[in-house]
Amino acid sequence: MNRLKDLGTPRPRLAFMAACILLLATLPDFAQASGGLQRVNSFMAGIVTVLRGASVATVTIAIIWAGYKLLFRHADVLDVVRVVLAGLLIGASAEIARYLLT
């Protein structure tokens, strides 16, 4: 019987992967990858900064558009409220996600 052929079945492969994951999870050096966690945190902080800037720009554009429509096009208030609320939801999404994750 060829033992290498038996590794193609799902059960031995699953057991081998589970053993490797348990081994890597118990060793903190492998889990933290010697400083890699700090690099990932700084990268994600940069992404959060960009998302905050984009959210401020989105809310600003929505409010400017709503003001233009109300003042110069004499639009209905309900049409403008939808755009302002959508802009606020898009703009607040980064802060809502930060609140939920921390």
Curated annotation (Swiss-Prot):
Signal peptide (from-to): 1-31
InterPro entries per the UniProt record, alphabetical: TrbC/VirB2
Family that this chain belongs to: Belongs to the PtlA family.
The name this protein goes by in its record: Type IV secretion system protein PtlA homolog
UniProt topology in membrane: Multi-pass membrane protein
Keywords recorded for this protein, A-Z: Cell membrane, Membrane, Signal, Transmembrane, Transmembrane helix
Gene: ptlA
Transmembrane segments: 45-65, 77-97
